[in-house]
C-alpha cells in the first residue's frame, strides 16, 4: 500500500448519517483547511521521504515566529500558519514546494486514518467526580 500525504483539519462536531436501509451511522464533521507544502525531505539527503505541510491561519505577528519559520513563510509568500506537520510518503508521491492540498486530494470512498491532539481535561473530570461524591 502506497503512502500518500495527509491533510490538516479541525473537528467541528459529531452527527449521524442514515444509509439506504435506514441504519444510523455516527460521523465526525471535519473542517479541512488549505494545506501548503513547505518542505520536502528525500531519502538521498535525509534517509527518509516526507512532506512538511503548513495549515490553519493563526499567527498574525511574524515577529513572534522563530527566524527559520519567518524565512520559510517569506520564501513561500504566504501568511504565517499555526500548524506545521510532517507526513511520511513514498518517494513517488512527493509534491513540489508551494503546492496546495485540499479535500479534493482525497479519493471517493477512500478509508482514512485520523490522529488527533487532545486538550486534556482528565484533571477537570477528576475534580468533578470528587465534588459530586462529597
Model-identified regions with their sequence ranges:
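Extended basic (Lys/Arg/His-rich) segments that typically form rRNA-contacting surfaces
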Residues: 1-134
